[in-house]
């Protein structure tokens, strides 16, 4: 498990999240969306599968088929959920 900062432009907020770095990116996005919606007491419009997770450091869009470990994202990593 690692702790990362996830910035979500829709809410203009950054969230600290504990993530299993071996979990697939698609599942990570789904879990993040669920947690953020609960924290904000709202529902995200659109389809969760259309969200993208990006690594701020490398300026990469992360492939849903891979995992955070594949991108060498570690504790303190900064991600962007759009």
Regions of interest found by a model, annotated:
Residues 1-82:
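Ubiquitin system architectures
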């Amino acid at each position: 498990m690692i702790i990362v900062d996830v910035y979500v432009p829709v809410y203009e907020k950054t969230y600290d999240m504990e993530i299993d770095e071996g979990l697939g990116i698609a599942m990570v996005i789904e879990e993040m969306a669920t947690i953020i919606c609960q924290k904000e007491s709202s529902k995200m419009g659109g389809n969760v599968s259309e969200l993208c997770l990006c690594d701020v450091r490398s300026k990469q869009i992360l492939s849903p088929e891979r995992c955070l470990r594949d991108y060498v994202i570690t504790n303190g990593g900064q991600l962007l959920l759009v």
